[in-house]
Every structure is written in C-alpha cells, then in structure tokens.
Amino acid sequence: MSTPKIIYTLTDEAPALATYSLLPIIKAFTGSSGIAVETRDISLAGRLIATFPEYLTDTQKISDDLAELGKLATTPDANIIKLPNISASVPQLKAAIKELQQQGYKLPDYPEEPKTDTEKDVKARYDKIKGSAVNPVLREGNSDRRAPLSVKNYARKHPHKMGAWSADSKSHVAHMDNGDFYGSEKAALIGAPGSVKIELIAKDGSSTVLKAKTSVQAGEIIDSSVMSKNALRNFIAAEIEDAKKQGVLLSVHLKATMMKVSDPIMFGQIVSEFYKDALTKHAEVLKQIGFDVNNGIGDLYARIKTLPEAKQKEIEADIQAVYAQRPQLAMVNSDKGITNLHVPSDVIVDASMPAMIRDSGKMWGPDGKLHDTKAVIPDRCYAGVYQVVIEDCKQHGAFDPTTMGSVPNVGLMAQKAEEYGSHDKTFQIPADGVVRVTDESGKLLLEQSVEAGDIWRMCQAKDAPIQDWVKLAVNRARATNTPAVFWLDPARAHDAQVIAKVERYLKDYDTSGLDIRILSPVEATRFSLARIREGKDTISVTGNVLRDYLTDLFPIMELGTSAKMLSIVPLMSGGGLFETGAGGSAPKHVQQFLEEGYLRWDSLGEFLALAASLEHLGNAYKNPKALVLASTLDQATGKILDNNKSPARKVGEIDNRGSHFYLALYWAQALAAQTEDKELQAQFTGIAKALTDNETKIVGELAAAQGKPVDIAGYYHPNTDLTSKAIRPSATFNAALAPLA
C-alpha cells in the first residue's frame, strides 16, 4: 500500500445514519495528511445484494466487501473501523429481502421449507447472512476492551441513574441443574493437524454424517456438549409454575442473534411450553399456515391474519386464556402488548440482564410498571455470573457510578474461538442415538448419547489465539499495574484444557510483581465486585462468550452504556480492527428519527475508535500527522463530554448531528492551537475561525431540521441522496468543510 488506508464500514440502522454526517468530517480532516479513508459496505442489505449477483442487473451488483475485509484482516496493512451491524434474525432477514424486492432487486424469497435443490441453495446462502455473520470474519485477533479515562471521569462527574435495590427483592436467575451444555461437556486436545468427522449413529445402527470435515490444527482444543430437549422442557415447566407461585414476572434471556442455530430452538421450546394449551388445541391449523415456534409468538400473530376472522378471534382468545393461567411475562413494549416471547431477537442476554440489574432487578410488566423478575437462562455455563451480581446488589445495594471501579476485558475470540464459532457444528438431532467425533484414522475423540430433538454442538479453540490472548493479558496487567483474572471453570471439560495451556504459556513471561489468577466465573465475579465497590479496577481475561457479556455488564453499570467503550482488536498479523463500542445498532433511534427528525445515536464510540485507528496508522506508517490528528481528536472528544455536547433524547435538544458539529469545531480548534505540525496548524486556523464564528448559525440550522417526519425511502437500504440531505441539513456547516474536501 502506498497511501495508508483506513477502511470505515457502512453498517445498519442508527450508526449507518450517523455515518452520513460523520464520514464527511473525517475525510475533510484527514485528507491533507496522506491518509485515504475508504468505505466498505457490510450492511445487511449490502450483504444480501452481494450474495445473489445472478438475480440482479449489472448496475445493481456490488462486490462482496465482507469477504474482502476478511482477507485484509489477515494482513499487516489492515486498519478497519467497524461500526455495529444487524445480526439478523429470520424476521429481520425477511423484512430486508422484502424491502430490496420493492426497490427493484429481484432477490429470491427466503424459503422456510426448501423442497427443490435451488431452494435449498438459496436458503443455505441466506442462512450464512443470518445471525452474527460479520464479526467472526473480521476478528482475526483477540479483544482489548476498556473505558477510556475521559469517559470514566465524565461518568464519575455525571453519574447515570441506577435503580435502588431492596434486600427482599424476589428477582433471581433460574438455570438448569442437569441436561444442559455445561453438564454434558467433553473435550479433547488435537495432536496432529488434519480434520474430524461428526456423525450420528442412530439406535437402529444407521449412520448420518452431520459434518464430513472440520479442519483442526495441532494443539487445538475441541469440545462437544448436548442440551437435552426433555430436560429443558421439564425445567421450563417447573420455572413457569415457580414464577406464578412467587408472583414474579417470567423472562427469558438468550442470544438468538449470535447463537443462531441453538438459541432459536431453545426459545421455541420455551414458547411451546408457555403457550402449550393454545398451541396444542390449534396445532393442525397452525401447521397449515406455517407457524414456527422458533420465531416466537409474534410469528403466530403475523400468520393467523390469513385465516377467517372467526378463527383468528378464537386463537387470540385462547392465547389470552393462557395469559390468565400463566405468570405475567416481562414485556418488550407493554403499550403494544409485545412480550419477551414475541420475537427471539428482542431480548438479548448481554444487554437485557445488565438493564434489569440497573433497574433494581426489575423488568417491565404488562401493566407498564417495573416488577421483580425470574430471569431464565437455561444453560449453566455463565448464568451464575448474573446471579452473583443480583445477590451482591441485594446485600450491598446498587453500584455507585461516582466511585465504582472498572473491569476492562481481554477476550479470546480470534479464529472463531469457542461457542461463537460453533454454528456450523450445531445440530438439532433427528433420532435417538450417539454422536461421535472421529479423526481421519477413525480414532474416537468425543462421544455423546443424544435423543431426538436435543441440540448437539462442537466448539473449537486454536492454540495460536490462546497464546496471543495470554500475551495480551500479561501486557495489559503490566501496562496498567492491575490484577488480571482468567475466568475459567476447572469443572468444565473445555476450561480445564484451557487452564493447562494458560498455566504453561504464563511461564513464557516475566510476571514478577503482577497479580494474575485463575478463578471460576462465579468466584471471579465475586472477586471483581468486591474490588469494584472499593473503587479498584480488575482485568477480566475471558473466553469469547464472557468477553461479550462482561463488556456489556460492567460498562452499563459504570457508564450507563456499553457504546462508550474503547474496543480494539490487535490483529494477529499486525493490523488493527477498531470496533466502535460494544452496543447494538439501536433500531429505536431510527424509529425516532423517521418520526420526528431527531437522531439520538451517540457517536462517542466512533470518535474513540477513530483516534485509536489514527494512532495505529501513525505508528505503523511513521506518519506524524496522523499522531497529531489522533491526539487533537482525543482533546476534542474530552471537550464534548466536559461541555455536555453529546446527543440528548428529545426534539429541541442537541442530537447526533449537533454533536458532530461540535466535534469538528473542537477538533479544528485543537489543531489550530497545537504547534507540533505547522502545516496542520495553518490549514485549520481558518477552518476553526469559520466554525467558531458561525456556531450559532450552524446550531440553528441543525435544530431547524428537527421536529418533522423524515422520508429516506428505506430502512435497511435507504436512498443515499435523501439520507445525506436529511442528515446534513446545515448549508453553512457543509460550506465550512468544503475547502478541506
């Protein structure tokens, strides 16, 4: 590469809208410093369009940018800023396909039950786009996530609201005690490179190959586990009864987006059990209209619209009768009657549990009020972490954002580590029997008894990423002089193998004076919470799932959101992936923008990632201008926080676009004031003056654009001209940036 490049990703929903405003500013400020800022489209719509070129006209076709970035991530030149994207559930996938079809893209329909070879191929291609299809491709490194000092200081000065806790709160986590993934896990260490075969030997002796070939490397850990359908159903039935008896809300917390094979099936089992009476009574007609429990009870409401009105009313009445008998469900939207069981992707454990803990352990009930809640997290692997936090809050009260310590994370995720890489090795078992994993010589590595309907899965964790993860943990512990805790459970087969590797690889480093320990997740939570309450920091060194969960849990307690985290992925080949926060893509922000022209998305995550990206580029390419841009951007970000120029929540107040103006103003002022680079100083002195002189006018033009509905001709694939006009409504601001373009 001659010119150093930063790749800025185009994604979905609120961050995608914000990009229309922020990207022109980034390009304007970096253009003169020998830095090319390019975009690549990894949005849901973009990935759909790139996957089906043979259905499209030449002008509609686009390149497969995700595949290109996946290759780039394995090179030292990678410098990618990754914004949150949709991890599509089936309902979202179908909605995006429909929108594109209406825009003239002749994409095939999503075949729920493919019959022909063509339909099977179409479904397989669509299914690759489903769930968390982006992050595993780009994450060719492990994760370093922490709250930057400026953000932590701001949170201490301006604490977010935390709900008070009562010692007699009835809220708790409910998990299985047998028959889950945790209880059944087995693991093996791979001796030589090659591949393994996964097959089901049924009771009658017949054999079905579930996956013919999965490549493995020497030193890799593989594990397998089973979620028993019968054990899950028995557990759910008992918990429904218990919630009714205790008078608490029933809520279910899974991750149907990322765990796109296993969790929708578990969700479906819970829906089946809860609505059993109504679903059994109408089983025949529901089968005819194609209702799928895995898509939630919302799918039933959508599909019964094709039935005669009398039949619709009968089914709806029977569902209401279920609600009268069952415990009250936690609500996603009590005004609209949308329950926790409507859509699998509405309640996602890593976001929903911290929100519940922050709200005094309560969730919203059908009456629009907060109530104590039973949080059902079926598998035991990580459920205990949340139960410990609840117990701690019941004993000591809510956390205090003005004094609490921080829990930065070093997470193992490179090369699709652990559960988050298991989707292509997860199966719903069709018949009773045994699942066997064998190597190329036929040697048996793993074996498990299964019953029809069970979920069986295999996970992998390669040796090089584990070595890199241990190195990153030691580096962060040394750099910050903070205790580092490996969250590993010796009672789990997989973790026992990882512990052996961690103990071995720690010997490669000088750890004198460092506090590095290995604790089970439950013990690690207790240890970290005790330190948090003393105002002390503790590094969590975790596997892939806890990386995801904890980088929501602790930041939401500390900062009120996980979107304000610095999220760096030092790629194993030397490049950098800079993720903008750890939150999602905020569909409610888009809804508000379309209804009233107000975008409340906070781009702080993008500001932090851009500064880290510029710093990486400056060091990698010996580009001092990039380092000046990075340090002045950090100053500007700090000033936005100090002067309270982040987006508010309602029309008439500053929104995302206003915060971008202030970023440009403060960044230009910092560049004009610095003396390290005279060229940049001279170039930005005039810009800083123009923005300063026109502050009132620009703020007025941005405010005038609020308060009315906005039409951008699409949700997943909006019209670029209409969106740009809506997101950049200040002619004065646009003109001030023009000389830099």
Swiss-Prot record:
Its EC number is 1.1.1.42. NADP(+) binds at residues 85, 87, 135, 585, 589, 600, 602, 649. GO terms for cellular component: cytoplasm. GO terms for biological process: glyoxylate cycle; tricarboxylic acid cycle. Catalyzes the oxidative decarboxylation of isocitrate to 2-oxoglutarate and carbon dioxide with the concomitant reduction of NADP(+). It catalyses: D-threo-isocitrate + NADP(+) = 2-oxoglutarate + CO2 + NADPH. Belongs to the monomeric-type IDH family. It is found in: Cytoplasm. Mn(2+) binds at residues 350, 548. Monomer. Consists of two distinct domains, a small domain (domain I) and a large domain (domain II). The structure of the large domain repeats a motif observed in the dimeric IDH. Such a fusional structure by domain duplication enables a single polypeptide chain to form a structure at the catalytic site that is homologous to the dimeric IDH, the catalytic site of which is located at the interface of two identical subunits. The lineage of its organism: Bacteria, Pseudomonadati, Pseudomonadota, Gammaproteobacteria, Pseudomonadales. PANTHER family: ISOCITRATE DEHYDROGENASE (NADP(+)), ISOCITRATE DEHYDROGENASE [NADP]. D-threo-isocitrate binds at residues 132, 135, 139, 145, 255, 420, 547. Its cofactor is Mg(2+); Mn(2+). Binds 1 Mg(2+) or Mn(2+) ion per subunit. Its main location: cytoplasm. Disulfide bonds: none annotated. GO terms for molecular function: isocitrate dehydrogenase (NADP+) activity; metal ion binding. The gene is icd. Activity is inhibited in the presence of Ca(2+). Keywords: Cytoplasm, Glyoxylate bypass, Magnesium, Manganese, Metal-binding, NADP, Oxidoreductase, Tricarboxylic acid cycle. Optimum temperature is above 40 degrees Celsius. This is Isocitrate dehydrogenase [NADP].
